From Swiss-Prot:
SMART domains: HATPase_c, HisKA. It is found in: Cell membrane. GO terms for molecular function: ATP binding; phosphoprotein phosphatase activity; phosphorelay sensor kinase activity. The gene is nisK. Keywords: ATP-binding, Cell membrane, Kinase, Membrane, Nucleotide-binding, Phosphoprotein, Transferase, Transmembrane, Transmembrane helix, Two-component regulatory system. It holds the Pfam family HisKA. Its EC number is 2.7.13.3. It catalyses: ATP + protein L-histidine = ADP + protein N-phospho-L-histidine. CDD domains: HATPase_SpaK_NisK-like, HisKA. Gene3D superfamilies: 1.10.287.130, Histidine kinase-like ATPase, C-terminal domain. This is Nisin biosynthesis sensor protein NisK. It comes from Lactococcus lactis subsp. lactis.
Amino acid sequence: MGKKYSMRRRIWQAVIEIIIGTCLLILLLLGLTFFLRQIGQISGSETIRLSLDSDNLTISDIERDMKHYPYDYIIFDNDTSKILGGHYVKSDVPSFVASKQSSHNITEGEITYTYSSNKHFSVVLRQNSMPEFTNHTLRSISYNQFTYLFFFLGEIILIIFSVYHLIREFSKNFQAVQKIALKMGEITTFPEQEESKIIEFDQVLNNLYSKSKELAFLIEAERHEKHDLSFQVAALSHDVKTPLTVLKGNIELLEMTEVNEQQADFIESMKNSLTVFDKYFNTMISYTKLLNDENDYKATISLEDFLIDLSVELEELSTTYQVDYQLVKKTDLTTFYGNTLALSRALINIFVNACQYAKEGEKIVSLSIYDDEKYLYFEIWNNGHPFSEQAKKNAGKLFFTEDTGRSGKHYGIGLSFAQGVALKHQGNLILSNPQKGGAEVILKIKK
């Protein structure tokens, strides 16, 4: 690539192009004027006086001499004052006649009628102090106005041409920036790294290419880390589940023997603990699978079918937890985009959390669905204690717990999973305490 230059210099180059073009345009106008005068298409501004020295001049002699001058004229007979010849416009005849009758020059504005005579003839010349077209048809257009219009149009074309090339060059550079920006972070090999003659754009392009490669490397490294994490959690789950399975079998064997009431309580407690552990590791596996999930999150989903399938599971859970469950649909939306499996699992996790912390004795949990121009909202509310400020800020984090309040009995894997699903759907998880009391979790996704 040739020599590079700054953006300021490129703009000044465009300005200089316009200035040089303007000077050339002026020279063109001067040359055009000189050429038209040479071929007799416009009259000059100088005043001439025709001399009729000889009384032997004929009309033909006068007409032959007048062909050398770009002026209108009329030849009068001195005896009869009749027009014997000439080159003129009928509308100017009264002025010619007035000059003949007065035997003097007369001036009307910028036009002078010059009187000359001998014994037989009188000649009146029409001369304009300003250049004008000698062609009677074109004379209605002022030559000065013609030059102004010519200069104005030429200047506009010149400016448009110069600005167009400037904008075109800038546009080409912006398109190069857009091209790399749209592929930022993708692992791709550019056939040829684009360069710019403008220093500022070239620096931006080089920086974007460099950052794109770095980002692609980091994304790929993170993807490998997620694969490793998924494998490690799966291996850990298998390693832990094996002794738990053995322990579960031993407990079942103990149940088959004769045990007293206290021993039966111990066995029941161990079974509950095993169930908690099993659920805990299953949730961990689900969370790591979500991190490593490459499934499509843009599938078209029927909202009605989705709610029907979801309600079946939520109603079963509400029966298990002895909760008064309500479904409230506040939208006319028919379809949306997302991943059915991930979304239903996230809502079930939130629903279970709401059931566990609803008000004892009269548990109420509701699921409300509504939307706006960009997002679809799934709002799950219960009538339990409100979230603490710490929980509202951190409940979506993995392994979050606090000593008191809503998170005192569990870890935040369920809500962390829901937060991950929301982010996959270009949304967010919102925890709030409404004015009507209780607590609510809103899963917001892009429609």
